[in-house]
């Protein structure tokens, strides 16, 4: 199997849109968390994971999923404001905590300068019993491969 560079699925770029700003013309704080989730989803897709096998949808009954991955903690730090048209780089650094949880660390950069960070902790649970369970094979592989030579 060909060795892939994790940067292919862990570093993404985006441009700030008008609808993501508040009345002061600055990105609204909640957008960072939305961008984090979108970055994570895109990362999983680029890695080769089919999203509907990980996240519930109207096409799949939640009881058909092996695990659910709820957020149990999140926090953000903002160092500079962002405005419409700003281009930013989002770097994702996943870290496995134990057999049932992981944290997604995000660094937001503009022109090479770090302008914000977030971390979001997920726990793997059985979607029916809501009890902690082991992470799926797909997520474990993504976490393992994401930690190699970044």
Curated annotation (Swiss-Prot):
It comes from Prochlorococcus marinus (strain NATL1A). It catalyses: 1,4-dihydroxy-2-naphthoyl-CoA + H2O = 1,4-dihydroxy-2-naphthoate + CoA + H(+). It is an enzyme of class 3 (hydrolase). CDD domains: 4HBT. GO terms for molecular function: 1,4-dihydroxy-2-naphthoyl-CoA thioesterase activity. This is 1,4-dihydroxy-2-naphthoyl-CoA hydrolase. InterPro entries: DHNA_CoA_hydrolase (IPR022829), HotDog_dom_sf (IPR029069). Pathway: Cofactor biosynthesis; phylloquinone biosynthesis; Quinol/quinone metabolism; 1,4-dihydroxy-2-naphthoate biosynthesis; 1,4-dihydroxy-2-naphthoate from chorismate: step 7/7. Keywords: Hydrolase. GO terms for biological process: phylloquinone biosynthetic process. Catalyzes the hydrolysis of 1,4-dihydroxy-2-naphthoyl-CoA (DHNA-CoA) to 1,4-dihydroxy-2-naphthoate (DHNA), a reaction involved in phylloquinone (vitamin K1) biosynthesis. Its EC number is 3.1.2.28. Belongs to the 4-hydroxybenzoyl-CoA thioesterase family. DHNA-CoA hydrolase subfamily. The active site is at 22. The keyword Metal-binding does not apply.
